[in-house]
Amino acid sequence: MCVNFVPGIKKIYSQKQTHAQALEILLCFCRKISGFDESQLQKASAYEAMLEAAKHGIVEFIIEMTRVCPDLLWVVDEDLRGIFSHAILCRREKIFNYIFQLKGSRQLVTSHIDAFDNNMLHLAGMLAPSSELDLRPGAALQMQRELQWFKVFIPLAHFI
């Protein structure tokens, strides 16, 4: 196979295989939990997995899990922050867009208040995690990205 002869291609091919295998495991897990009740989902750590996927921006995970168990979309942590809140806090644009485009979710997610009385505007105004800020060199570019992120929420303020 010519994959071994081209530098860099082997690494990409390996990553693609790993992604395909992870997706297959996810689909198997989804088939397994499709009939689970709330306590079984808790025991299977499905709630924690959803929140972690939101924090890390793994939109495929959120899509597949909510396809088999739509109630997982509304899971919250001890601070009453759900998937949407973590997507905002961690600047996970794909997850934000996925949830925001879902029918009937716009009013629910925009009006949600966490345990600290923060709504989505407050969360958007908080500083991004350092791992996200470090993706952009220089304070000016970091500030520009933070401002762009916050401006997304200005038109949505009337929902709050």
Where in the sequence are the language-model features?
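Acidic, Ser/Thr- and Pro/Gly-rich low-complexity regulatory segments
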Residues: 1-160
